[in-house]
Amino acid sequence: MKRLELRAKQIRQMSKEERQETLKNLKESLLHERALISMGGSSPSPGKVRGIRRQIARLLTVEREEKR
């Protein structure tokens, strides 16, 4: 599954519901990737976990910015 990189500008343009849905999907993807790795296999793309974690961080950062 190819995932587009979300930039902060794109995230800010999303509605709160869209951000929550995207965050949920990213966390599920991260869980899936970590499960593959823990079962002894290696991820087809080693940088994928790092990319997913960064996207989650971007989403959470924008969420916290909007709370201020």
From Swiss-Prot:
MF-aspect GO terms: structural constituent of ribosome
Q: Which domain of life is it from?
A: Archaea
CDD domains associated with the record: Ribosomal_L29_HIP (cd00427)
**Which is a GO BP term held by this UniProt record?**
translation
> What are the protein's UniProt keywords?
Ribonucleoprotein, Ribosomal protein
Q: Which Pfam families match?
A: Ribosomal_L29
What GO terms fall under cellular component here? ribonucleoprotein complex; ribosome
Show the Gene3D superfamilies listed in the entry: 1.10.287.310
Look up keyword Ribonucleoprotein and say if it applies. yes
Question: Family, per the entry?
Answer: Belongs to the universal ribosomal protein uL29 family.
Protein name listed in UniProt: Large ribosomal subunit protein uL29
Query: Can you name the source organism?
Result: Thermoplasma acidophilum (strain ATCC 25905 / DSM 1728 / JCM 9062 / NBRC 15155 / AMRC-C165)
The opening ranks of the lineage are:
Archaea, Methanobacteriati, Thermoplasmatota, Thermoplasmata, Thermoplasmatales
Q: Which gene encodes it?
A: rpl29
